[in-house]
Amino acid sequence: MNLHEYQAKQIFAQYRLPVSKGIVCHSLDDAVSAIHTLAGDTWAAKCQVHAGGRGKAGGVKLVRSEAEIREFCNQWLGQRLVTFQTDKNGQPVNTIYLEETCLIERELYLGAVIDRSSQKIVFMASNAGGMNIEDVAAQTPELIHKATIDPLTGAQAFQGRELAFKLGLSGDQIKQFAHLFVQLAKLFIEKDLALLEVNPLVLTKQGQLLCLDAKMVIDSNALYRHPELKALQDPSQEDAREADAAKWDLNYVALDGNIGCMVNGAGLAMGTMDIVKLHGGRPANFLDVGGGATKERVSEAFKLILSDQNVKAVLVNIFGGIVRCDLIAEGIIAAVNEVGINIPVIVRLEGTNAELGREILANSGLRLIAANTLTQAAQLAVKAAEGK
């Protein structure tokens, strides 16, 4: 689950991490009032959306007067912000965060993720702050310095000092960085995070480190023990179809293609998408109905796919290990009868009760296209989506 920048910074403050003073604005009146409360004569106005690239898209701007903040709010509040991380529709801007500014000497990067190979938290620091860290890692990997957190001992101050030295910090800056490093690691563990990012972490002209931006992604599987974080969830930033899928324990991710995919098992779902792409098609979604799929869940999954107006064909690829192919077949028939369908549906069934499943589909009287192999299914789906 993603948090907004202002929410992450509120949590940062609880952990004694340095952040600028800011005010959350839900309306134009809030913003006008905020600039008379905040110090200074220049403020940063930031659209609050669950996506990066806000600055390049015009969603972050320095404002110096009431007229400028009015213009910014009128431009964005109630509108949608499109960045390189969103789809073509963008994300709704319901909130603007207005905060005090500072004079910047240097921009750094500091982030943490779970390294699955070592099963430990890995911190990454770089002098290339304010940039896309993926680009830095690909083009100049030598600029990224790492520190691994042992889960038994936790983050140690000496690790923070080592990173500070590598970043070229000196004097009191090293002490500041070590404190920041230890507190961020504590936050990461206590809040069950999947990702934590401060980009940029700035060194001000006064020699102080300041978290100018904050990104937190919480492990959704751990939300049951963090009701205070669950309460921060913003449904408006989530795809409505993905939210509906979660109600049925379906793993769904919307994409921008035109071939709907329904598969059981995450690995098989990824492989299905790959082979569709290999044959020139574009998957419209990732959808894993899971190993314990019921007829009702399959029916809901099918309706979910058909709710996407871009879908021109549907590919159902089921390998019956835990799930039975005859149940999948009944779910498909129920969904088609309930929703109605005028696009081609290609079905490939293998495994437990596959023959029975194919027989049920064949006797349904519906216009379903049977495929014997995954390759054949992908080829048929691509042709069907192209209207051939």
UniProtKB/Swiss-Prot annotation:
Pathway(s): Carbohydrate metabolism; tricarboxylic acid cycle; succinate from succinyl-CoA (ligase route): step 1/1
HAMAP family, per the entry: Succ_CoA_beta
Disulfide bonds: none
Keyword field contains ATP-binding: yes
Assembly mode: Heterotetramer of two alpha and two beta subunits.
Single GO term (MF): succinate-CoA ligase (ADP-forming) activity
Keywords carried by this UniProt record: ATP-binding, Ligase, Magnesium, Metal-binding, Nucleotide-binding, Tricarboxylic acid cycle
Protein residues bound to Mg(2+): 199, 213
Residues involved in substrate binding: 264, 321-323
Similarity annotation: Belongs to the succinate/malate CoA ligase beta subunit family.
InterPro entries xref list: ATP-grasp_succ-CoA_synth-type, ATP_grasp_subdomain_1, Succ-CoA_synthase_bsu_CS, SUCC_ACL_C, Succ_CoA_ligase-like_bsu, Succinyl-CoA_synth-like
One GO BP annotation of this record: tricarboxylic acid cycle
Catalytic function, reaction form: succinate + ATP + CoA = succinyl-CoA + ADP + phosphate; GTP + succinate + CoA = succinyl-CoA + GDP + phosphate
Protein name in UniProt: Succinate--CoA ligase [ADP-forming] subunit beta
GO cellular component, one term: cytosol
SUPFAM superfamilies recorded: Glutathione synthetase ATP-binding domain-like, Succinyl-CoA synthetase domains
Function, as annotated: Succinyl-CoA synthetase functions in the citric acid cycle (TCA), coupling the hydrolysis of succinyl-CoA to the synthesis of either ATP or GTP and thus represents the only step of substrate-level phosphorylation in the TCA. The beta subunit provides nucleotide specificity of the enzyme and binds the substrate succinate, while the binding sites for coenzyme A and phosphate are found in the alpha subunit.
E.C. numbers: 6.2.1.5
Cofactors: Mg(2+)
Broad class of enzyme this protein falls into: ligase
Binding residue positions for ATP: 46, 53-55, 99, 102, 107
Cofactor note: Binds 1 Mg(2+) ion per subunit.
A Pfam family the protein falls into: Ligase_CoA
